[in-house]
From Swiss-Prot:
The gene is glgB. Pathway: Glycan biosynthesis; glycogen biosynthesis. InterPro entries: A-amylase/branching_C, Branching_enzy, GlgB, GlgB_N, GlgB_N_E_set_prok, Glyco_hydro_13_cat_dom, Glyco_hydro_13_N, Glyco_hydro_b. SUPFAM superfamilies: (Trans)glycosidases, E set domains, Glycosyl hydrolase domain. Monomer. This is 1,4-alpha-glucan branching enzyme GlgB. One of its GO terms (biological process) is glycogen biosynthetic process. The active site is at 412 (nucleophile), 467 (proton donor). It comes from Burkholderia vietnamiensis (strain G4 / LMG 22486). One of its GO terms (cellular component) is cytosol. Belongs to the glycosyl hydrolase 13 family. GlgB subfamily. It comes from the Bacteria. CDD domains: AmyAc_Glg_BE (cd11322), E_set_GBE_prok_N (cd02855). Its EC number is 2.4.1.18. It holds the Pfam family CBM_48.
Amino acid sequence: MTDTLFDRRDIDALLGGRHPDPFACLGPHGEAGRTVVRALLPGALRVRAVTPGGDELGALACVDEAGCFAGTITHDGRYRLAIDWPDAQQVTDDAYAFGTLLDDAALARFAAGDPAAVLDCLGATPIRVDGVDGVRFAVWAPNAQRVSVVGNFNSWDGRRHPMRLRRPWGVWELFVPGIGPGEHYKYELCAADGSLLPHKADPCARATEAPPRTASVVADTAALDGFGWHDAGWIDARPDAGRRFRVPWSIYEVHAESWQRVPEEMDRSATWDELAERLIPYVKGMGFTHVEFMPISEYPFGGSWGYQPLAQFAPSARFGPVDGFARFVDRAHAAGIGVIVDWVPAHFPNDAHGLAQFDGSALYEHADPREGMHPDWNTCVFNLGRNEVSAFLIASALAWARRYHVDGIRVDAVASMLYRDYSRKEGEWVPNVYGGRENLESVAFLRTLNDALHGAAAPAGVVTIAEESTAWPGVTAPTGDGGLGFDFKWNMGWMHDTLAYLHEDPIHRRYHHDRMTFGLVYAFSERFVLPLSHDEVVHGKGSLAAKMPDDAWQRLATLRAYFGFMWAHPGKKLLFMGSEFAQWSEFAHDGTPHWDLLDAPAHRGVQRLVRDLNRAYASEPALHALDCDAAGFTWLIGDDRDNSVLAFARRDDSGRVVVAICNFTPVPRSGYRVGLPAPGQWRELMNTDAAVYGGSNAGNDGAVWAQDVPAHGQPWSATLRLPPLATLWLAPA
C-alpha cells in the first residue's frame, strides 16, 4: 500500500531534480480523511513522524531506495521527523510542512523594481515560523527549472531541499527549520534545459566565507539590524544638501587589505577591530575628515582590489565578521571621521559561483556580448534596464547606508556605464533606441540611485560621489534639472593635467603652463573632488614622488609644492595611502605601504606637511566654504609661464581670504611682487619649503606687509621671496 502514497512520477521527478512544485507532494497532505506525510531524504535508513515532545506518530516507509519515504498519521498538528542516518540520528521539523513565506505584494514590488522589496524578501533570513526557528531562503531565478538550497545541513545534496517557486515573480523560497546564523550555504540550480549549473553563492548574502572559499553564510540579521550604535549625534549632525558642499572634505583613500598587515601571522590583513585601533587614530591625527575604502563587499580575486565584487551586500570576510565593520564605522564616527565606501554597479566577474548565467540564462547581465561583456576587464555588464537588477543594486547601496551607517558611496566606473561605445570599436556596440551612444538605462539607474540615497529610503546626509572621467554634462546637477544627481564628481582632468605638468623637467614647464590653469576654466561646472587616487600609483605609472623629475630632494620638494597647490585649489581633496609620506614605490595590493620610510626625516616632513595642510584647510573657511562656487576664487597671477609661478586668492562669503603662491621651478625668486586684496600685515599660513617639512627654509620670516602699490588687479601688493619648488599661503594677520 505504501507505494500508492507516493506517485511514481513525483518520485522520478524529485530524484531527477526536475519537479516543478515539490510542495505539491512533499510534506503533509490531507487525503481521504488521513494525513499523508512524504519526505525526500537520500541516505536515510529510517524515518518516523513524532510529536514535538517526541511521541511517535507513525513510521514513514521507504518507497524508493534512493530516499523517498511516505506514511500516514492521524495527528493534524505540528509534527517532526526523526531520522536515522548511517552515523547519526536527527530530529527536525519538516521544511515542507510550512506554507508560503513571502507576501505577494512585496514580491510584486520587487518585480516592479522596488529596492526595499529586495531587502525585505531576498537572501537568507533567520526567522521564526509557527514557533519554529530556522532560516528563510529566497532567491530570484525565474528561468531555472529547479532551485535547491544546499549546505552542511543537508550534506550539500541538492535533492534534499528543493525550493518553492513563486511563479509570477520568479522567486524561489524555502524555510529550513533548525538552522541559524553561521550556516554555510549555496544554491543548486537546474537550468531550463535540464542541465545542472555550478553551485551558486547567494546574490543577496549578508555574509560569506573568506576567499578562496566561496560559500555564502547565514548572517545574524537581527543582531546586525539591532546593532548597538552610538553615533546618533553624528548622523543627526551630518550636513544636509545645503551645507555639505561648504564643509571641508579631505579623504584618505585606503585599500583595507593592505594598509597594515599582521606579520606575526603570515602577513594576514588586519581585521576591522584591528583597523579601528590603528587606522582611525592615524586618520584623525593626520587631519583627514573621511576615510574612503576601496571596495569591501566580498570579492573572489584579491588582484581586483575589490573592483570585481560578487556579494554586494556583504563586507568581505577577509576582515573578520561582518559586525566588525559596523563597529569600525561606529568608532570612526565617535572620532569625528566619516566613512565612504567604493561601490561597483557597472560590472561583475564571470566566476562560476557568481551572477553570470545565474539561472542558466543572462539574468543579471545582457545576453548580447556587445552590451553584456566589458572589453577592458572581461567582466559582465549589469542589465540596468531590468527592474529586478536595478532594484538589486540600489538595495545594496541602501544596505550600506542603512545597516552600516556609511556616510558616502563612491560609484566606480560611471563613464563606462554612460556610454554604450565605451572602449568598444565600431560594430562592437549597440546604439540606444534613438541611434545614439548614450546608455539611457544607465542614466535612469543613476538618477534613481541618487534619488534613493538622498531620499527617505536612506538615513539623512548620505553623500554620493561619481568616478566619471568624461565631460558628461550635469553629473552633479539635480535629477529634477536633468542631471545625474551626484553630490560630487572626481576631477580626473585636473589630476591628469597637473601630474603631466609636474612630470616635465622644470626648465620645460613654461611650455606646459596651461595644464596648471586649464582646470579653472571648468572648476565650477560641477562639484569636484580632486583625486590623487590609487589609479595614479599603479600599473607602471609610478608613485606620486617617483613621477617628479630630478634628484630625491627636488622630487620631494615638488611633491610638497603640489600638495600646497592642491589643498589651496577649489575642490574637495582625496589622497591615496602611502602618498602622504611620499612613498617611492607603486601601490602593491599584496604588500603594504612602506612605513619604514618614516624613519627618514624627509618623508616624515612630507607626512607632517599633509597633516598641517589638512588642519589649515579644515580650520580656514576661505579654503573650503566656496570650494564649489566661482565666488570663492580669484586669479592673481595665472600667466607667468616664464617663471612657472601661479598665484590666486581663495575666500569665503564673509570676506576671509587666503592667497596661495606657487613656484614650480628650483630657482628662488626674490622681490617677486604679488597683488593682495587687503592692506596690512599678511602672515605665512603655510610654507611647503619650511625646514620641518624637509625644505630649505627659505621664505619671508613668517610675514609680509602689503604696500599701497596696485598689482594683478588688486589695490595692494607685496614683494615676496619665493622659495624653490614651493607653495606659500598668506592670510591677513
